[in-house]
Amino acid sequence: MLVEDGFVRWVGSDSGARSIADESATITELDGALLTPAFARALAPVAGKEAPEILDYLQAYRAAGYHTHTLLAGMEDVPDLVSALSYYSAEHGVPDIRLILNATCVETDELISAIKALRPLTEDERSVKGLQLVGIFVAPTEAPAAAQVAEDAALLLSIDASTSFANAADAALAVRETRPWLSIRLDAAISTPQDPITDEYLTQLAEARINLGLSVCEPEEDETANDTVQALLAHAGGEARESVASVARRANAAGTSIALGSDAQLYAPGAWSLIRELVNNEHGISARSAFAALTRGVYRLAHEENPFTGQFAPDTPAFVAQWRVEALMVQAPDSRVASWSTDPRARIPLLPVLDEDSPLPILESIYTESN
């Protein structure tokens, strides 16, 4: 792979790479390592977090192969966020932070003023490197009024689906009827027997071009033993909650654009362990699909202008993670159709073997912005 000025310029064979390398190129031999796009977090709330806590989060996720983060914060959280980014950039280089402004319970005039106040931090010569404002986050009942603000400011509209998916989906679909070009997403969605993510809703979201961010976190534990049991059941897709794998599989079948890791909690399971869980679940999805929902799907959820961001293609940002792995294969959730293949004509990426007996990949390094 040839990287220049922070962008992927070419991907091909070893022989092709050697033929185009010249004295100006710095050559890194992979020695059997695996290169993948760095992982991206779909939504992580930093409200009420001080700068050291935000910095700890960014560093912990960097060690797990993450570079891009969509962070949910209020105006009062911005100073701590900027401080954390300054420390992080000095040690690791500039991160890729997509900020969604929490506008729940915020009056329209106050929201417009907040967006104007953030513009110098994200757009002009005084801007914080790596920080961009991409959207506003509201409750379902606030979506109609916020949609006008988002459209006028050229921002996406994120609707909170953590407490009621049906209400959030209905609100998003209603907004779409009057605003055909507004970027709309549902965040922190889960499916429960009382509030299911139905196939009908998934089809409607796909047809309306509304993206879906699925939560992968367990609900925060309450003090009672029963609530703790329910929290454990939820992550496994027990009686209290449909598994993430099952929802993702149905969303893929409906053609709904999804991303994983859109959560109401700051910390979520790491990407490789999550992919392994999704592949090995009885209602699982392929490793390729799970990987895409933690990379390319996150950028689509953020309505990235370049549709190929999150994969290795010419003129995409070079957010590259290098991993040490034991073996690669094409993996499907059904072991009867899993197969070993190295034929590039199949255009199916080989990913690390992720069965329960295999070790997870170990991060060796991250390359970003040519660093």
Task: List each language-model region with its residue ranges.
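Active-site microenvironment of metallo-dependent hydrolases
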Residues: 1-5, 9-20, 47-69, 73-74, ...
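Generic beta-strand/beta-sheet core signal
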Residues: 11, 72, 100-102, 139, ...
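Active-site metal-binding motif and surrounding structural segment of the metallo-beta-lactamase
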Residues: 16-36
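Di-metal (Zn2+ and/or Mg2+/Mn2+) metal-binding site signature of metallo-dependent hydrolases
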Residues: 33-53
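Metal-coordinating catalytic core of metallo-dependent amide/deamination hydrolases
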Residues: 75-181, 200-211
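Histidine/acidic-residue-rich catalytic or RNA/ligand-binding cores of hydrolases
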Residues: 82, 164-173, 194-203, 220-232, ...
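Phosphate/diphosphate-binding loops
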Residues: 97, 101, 128-140, 183-201, ...
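Short acidic/histidine-rich active-site segments
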Residues: 156-167, 213-217, 251-275, 298, ...
